[in-house]
């Protein structure tokens, strides 16, 4: 009799605990309705424009900014705008069916109708992969037979993912390498050796030294497609093509090798050369207000600047051997730390 009572009490206690857990889960879903996992921003440390022409690139996840699919029965403001953009993305993917990937369009459409939106802190038009994170989240949620991050990611699987993401992100930019969504989806540093050779990269762990990589906020929104169009027009010029192959790509590749192998002194020499080449040949991609401080960094050696993504606004990437000195030189601007040497 006693055992029965004990068992009965235990059962009742377990039921009570389960009810409480379910109630907490219910409350959390109500307060923070989320359909999918978090996807992070990315920073292309090296390789902007060069990767279009098959040179090296190195991208790293940037966890300060992130986004996730959520839903709300009362959409307004940015959430409503995001929901409307998802409708356009849905229409694009459905109208441009690809053999690369298929989607559960029924669930996708129903979820949009139920108030789904992409809740993101990633600034748009800033070169840190806002559309890439969105594309990664849609693939993760709705792709059939998706390649998961838990699999053994062979080179062929990575290339297929990159191709899928290139197709999906072309909705936003007209032409996409697929690298931003790939980086966001994997949440790993990615080394691009060429269009057909990409791999996860091991980057040196951060140190508590003086040196740093940082973001400089231009406080202007940049658009990728016009910048890429300017670049493609420049590529028609033989002199520009020569500069790209002999200088831009050469310094970019050297920077990547130095960064991955921790050759800091050599890295800053190559970053300075790259910064000079970009200022001389990519001026339309650098906001006018930043031409002088770009030159100032090259003269003083307090910092060196380079494009972050396609340019035209958004963030500018900075490298400094003494971050405190760079902060003092750029005290009138908003800086954000990315990586410590």
PLM features per residue range, with description:
Residues 131:
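Phosphate-binding site recognition
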Residues 9, 27-127, 140-156, 304-307, ...:
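ATP-binding N-lobe of GHMP and related small-molecule kinases
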Residues 48, 52, 249-341:
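Glycine-rich, charge-dense phosphate/pyrophosphate-binding loop(s)
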Residues 201-256:
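Acyltransferase
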Residues 156-201:
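Alpha/beta catalytic cores of group-transfer enzymes, especially the acyltransferase/condensing modules
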């Amino acid at each position: 009799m006693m055992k029965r009572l004990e068992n009965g009490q235990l059962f009742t206690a377990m039921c009570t605990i389960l009810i409480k857990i379910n109630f907490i889960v219910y409350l959390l879903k109500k307060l923070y309705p989320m359909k999918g996992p978090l996807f992070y921003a990315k920073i292309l440390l090296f390789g902007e424009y060069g990767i279009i022409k098959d040179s090296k690139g190195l991208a790293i996840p940037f966890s300060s900014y992130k986004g996730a699919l959520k839903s709300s029965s009362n959409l307004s403001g940015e959430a409503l705008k995001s929901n409307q953009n998802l409708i356009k993305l849905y229409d694009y993917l459905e109208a441009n069916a690809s053999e690369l990937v298929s989607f559960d369009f029924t669930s996708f459409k129903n979820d949009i109708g139920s108030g789904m939106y992409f809740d993101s802190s990633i600034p748009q038009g800033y070169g840190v992969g806002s559309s890439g994170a969105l594309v990664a989240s849609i693939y993760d949620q709705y792709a059939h037979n998706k390649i998961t991050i838990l699999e053994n990611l062979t080179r062929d699987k990575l290339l297929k993912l990159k191709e899928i993401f290139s197709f999906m992100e072309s909705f936003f930019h007209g032409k996409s390498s697929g690298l931003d969504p790939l980086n966001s989806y994997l949440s790993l540093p990615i080394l691009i050796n060429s269009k057909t050779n990409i791999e996860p990269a091991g980057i040196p762990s951060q140190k508590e030294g003086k040196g740093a990589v940082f973001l400089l906020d231009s406080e202007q929104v940049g658009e990728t497609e016009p910048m890429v169009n300017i670049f493609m027009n420049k590529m028609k010029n033989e002199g520009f093509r020569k500069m790209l192959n002999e200088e831009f790509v050469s310094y970019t590749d050297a920077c990547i090798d130095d960064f991955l192998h921790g050759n800091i002194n050599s890295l800053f020499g190559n970053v300075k050369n790259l910064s000079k080449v970009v200022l001389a040949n990519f001026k339309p991609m650098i906001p006018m207000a930043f031409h002088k401080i770009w030159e100032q960094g090259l003269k003083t050696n307090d910092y060196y600047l380079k494009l972050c993504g396609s340019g035209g606004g958004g963030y500018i990437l900075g490298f400094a051997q003494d971050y405190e000195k760079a902060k003092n030189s750029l005290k009138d601007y908003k800086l954000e730390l990315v990586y410590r040497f």
